């Protein structure tokens, strides 16, 4: 999550340092890990341009998602989650783009170091927020599919907004704690608190968030298979959520392997830092493509407005009165409500 500079392990200091920059510890280079005694070759210079191009494409795509989901498409509980996901991705991609510009131009000095520090904090916070939103939207979608009647009657009107706000606050709190223990307390001497924070973040992401997003997705997969056997069209919204979780799991493999090998077996990370950063950037840039592919109508040969495509991606495929007048699920009922009543 940090800049693409060469790494040198300083004696007596667990934090990786960037030579030629300031003496502040380079803490967020591998996502959130501060690995001891890792000496890595600098990434190829072309990687900075690849990062910059990828971030700019992702910023354009997520910017369109912010515009359409925020101002053009009628809101429903799941579009609110996607809106906050796009906001987190924009923040992370922006911080990574600034890093790429600074590294490409070779900017040095106190001000450049300050911008890098701000981008590290911003990137970590946005990354944690985006990861924590995926289990929330997966669990809510699973509840709306498996228990539609109970879910619609019991669900608070503003549940999506409240959950997103809480996740933003928790991500900011965890980021501040990590910054405090690993930057302010780690300037003088290496501290065990920073290592504990790294372990805590790994447990939070890989042992808590990942299972919480995978289990609801397994339930959605079973639901999709049951509908396929009954020759019913599956919900596009299910495909969107399954695709987003799959992209995250695939893109986080390298980061997870690095963390697991080091903290469990004390084996140095096998992958270069820029590989894990590139995978995270791909994950943040891929969501607009997922919305587009899920929402496009293959039977339409002519060009369709993006608003129509994105709105179609939110459909859940349920028909009112399906299965002998069964209760419609959340998204169908929300889309029929006036715009001011969506939560």
UniProtKB/Swiss-Prot annotation:
Domain of life of the native organism: Eukaryota
Q: How does it sit in the membrane?
A: Multi-pass membrane protein
| Gene Ontology annotations of biological process type | G protein-coupled receptor signaling pathway
- Location in the cell: Cell membrane
Q: Name one GO molecular function term.
A: G protein-coupled receptor activity
Give the positions annotated as glycosylation sites. Answer: 4
Give any Gene Ontology cellular component: nuclear membrane
Gene expressing this chain: MRGPRF
Q: Species name for this entry?
A: Homo sapiens (Human)
Q: Which family does it belong to?
A: Belongs to the G-protein coupled receptor 1 family. Mas subfamily.
Region described as Disordered? 320-343
Write down the SUPFAM superfamilies for this protein, in alphabetical order: Family A G protein-coupled receptor-like
Protein's UniProt name: Mas-related G-protein coupled receptor member F
UniProt topological domain (Extracellular) ranges? 1-44, 105-123, 182-198, 264-273
Q: What does this protein do?
A: Orphan receptor. May bind to a neuropeptide and may regulate nociceptor function and/or development, including the sensation or modulation of pain.
In terms of CDD domains, this protein maps to: 7tmA_MrgprF
């Amino acid at each position: 999550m940090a800049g693409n500079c060469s790494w040198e392990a300083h004696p007596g200091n667990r934090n990786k340092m960037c030579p030629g920059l300031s003496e502040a510890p380079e803490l967020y280079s591998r996502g959130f890990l501060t690995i001891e005694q890792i000496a890595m070759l600098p990434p190829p210079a072309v990687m900075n341009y690849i990062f910059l191009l990828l971030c700019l494409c992702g910023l354009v795509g997520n910017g369109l998602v912010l515009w359409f989901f925020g101002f053009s498409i009628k809101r429903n509980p799941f579009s609110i989650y996607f809106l906050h996901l796009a906001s987190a991705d924009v923040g992370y991609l922006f911080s990574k783009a600034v890093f790429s510009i600074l590294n490409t131009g070779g900017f040095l000095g106190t001000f450049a170091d300050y911008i890098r520090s701000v981008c590290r904090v911003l990137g970590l916070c946005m990354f944690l927020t985006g990861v924590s939103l995926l289990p929330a939207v997966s669990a809510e979608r699973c509840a709306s599919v498996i228990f539609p009647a109970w879910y619609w009657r019991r669900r608070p009107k503003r549940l999506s907004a409240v959950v997103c706000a809480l996740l933003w606050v928790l991500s900011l709190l965890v980021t501040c704690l990590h910054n405090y223990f690993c930057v302010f307390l780690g300037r003088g001497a290496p501290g065990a608190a920073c290592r504990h924070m790294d372990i805590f973040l790994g447990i939070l992401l890989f042992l808590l968030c990942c299972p919480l997003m995978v289990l609801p997705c397994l339930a959605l997969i079973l639901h999709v298979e049951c509908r396929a056997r009954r020759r019913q069209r599956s919900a596009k919204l299910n495909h969107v959520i399954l695709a987003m979780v799959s992209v995250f799991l695939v893109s986080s493999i390298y980061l997870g392997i690095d963390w697991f090998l080091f903290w469990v077996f004390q084996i140095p990370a096998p992958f270069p830092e820029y590989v894990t950063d590139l995978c995270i950037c791909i994950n943040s840039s891929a969501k607009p493509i997922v919305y587009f592919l899920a929402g496009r109508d293959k039977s339409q040969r002519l060009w369709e407005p993006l608003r129509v495509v994105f709105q179609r991606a939110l459909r859940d495929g349920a028909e009112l009165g399906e299965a002998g007048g069964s209760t419609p699920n959340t998204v169908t009922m929300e889309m029929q409500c006036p715009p001011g009543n969506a939560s």
